[in-house]
Amino acid sequence: MNTFVVVFLLLTAILCHAEHALDETARGCNRLNKKCNSDGDCCRYGERCISTGVNYYCRPDFGP
């Protein structure tokens, strides 16, 4: 019984990690605080590509 639980949790963790990786490559978007070139090609909905002085990063867009 204990072995079954360990194997089940291991498989669940592997599947969740694989699904997360596929989701990011399918979107072509970077996660929050990653470098970007423009709003359209890397930021998720509700984020903007904002300059931090040297580089640009996707940050939440709270309006104008």
Curated annotation (Swiss-Prot):
Keyword Nucleus: no
Location within or outside the cell: Secreted
Covalent S-S links between cysteines: 29-43, 36-49, 42-58
Propeptide span(s): 19-27
Origin: domain of life: Eukaryota
GO cellular component term, pick one: extracellular region
GO molecular function annotation: calcium channel regulator activity; potassium channel regulator activity; toxin activity
Range of residues in the leader sequence: 1-18
UniProt keyword annotations, A-Z: Calcium channel impairing toxin, Disulfide bond, Ion channel impairing toxin, Knottin, Potassium channel impairing toxin, Ryanodine-sensitive calcium-release channel impairing toxin, Secreted, Signal, Toxin
Tissue specificity statement from the Swiss-Prot or TrEMBL entry: Expressed by the venom gland.
Domain remark from Swiss-Prot or TrEMBL: The presence of a 'disulfide through disulfide knot' structurally defines this protein as a knottin.
Functional summary from the UniProt entry: May increase intracellular calcium release through the activation of nuclear inositol 1,4,5-trisphosphate receptors (ITPR) of cardiomyocytes, thereby causing an increase in the contraction frequency of these cells.
Family that this chain belongs to: Belongs to the scorpion calcin-like family.
Name by which UniProt lists this protein: Toxin BmCa-1
